[in-house]
């Protein structure tokens, strides 16, 4: 597979992952709306708060994922996608296949 084909494959995976994260976020918004619309018994308040906390954590994680994916796509446009941001050496293809939005090689991933 040529480098250009490989980059195209990674780009498709990044966009697909971003779409999945957006879909998860949409589900979180719907769940939050359902929680706010229904009158609940006082005993259920703690459960509702726990669910809201989980949704907030998901929102943070989703935002981080989207930002990482967008950074990877931007690095791709700049021709820097497969280079480690720390040392400038190439990021292992196996690592990119596992985590296509990564910006560091496996050596520097262990130090972060």
Segments (PLM) and residue ranges:
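Interaction interfaces in information-processing and related assembly proteins
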Residues: 1-78
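Flexible coil/turn residues that form the inter-helical turn or adjacent wing/linker of helix-turn-helix
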Residues: 80, 89
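Residues immediately within or flanking Cys/His clusters that coordinate Zn2+
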Residues: 81, 102
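Short, cysteine/histidine-rich loop/knuckle motifs that typically chelate Zn2+
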Residues: 86-87, 107
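A short beta-strand motif that forms part of the nucleic acid-binding face
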Residues: 88, 100
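Short functional micro-motifs and their immediate structural scaffolds
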Residues: 91-92, 110
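Short Cys/His-rich "knuckle" micro-motifs
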Residues: 94-99
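Short microdomains enriched in Cys/His and/or Lys/Arg
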Residues: 103-112
């Amino acid at each position: 597979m040529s480098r250009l084909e490989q980059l195209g494959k990674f780009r498709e995976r990044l966009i697909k992952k971003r779409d999945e994260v957006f879909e998860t976020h949409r589900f979180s918004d719907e769940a939050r709306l359902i929680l706010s619309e229904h009158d609940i018994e006082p005993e259920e308040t703690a459960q509702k708060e726990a669910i809201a906390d989980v949704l907030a954590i998901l929102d943070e994680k989703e935002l981080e994922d989207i930002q990482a994916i967008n950074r990877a796509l931007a690095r791709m446009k700049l021709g820097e996608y497969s280079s480690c941001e720390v040392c400038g050496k190439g990021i292992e293809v196996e690592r990119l296949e596992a985590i296509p939005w990564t910006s560091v090689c496996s050596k520097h991933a262990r130090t972060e």
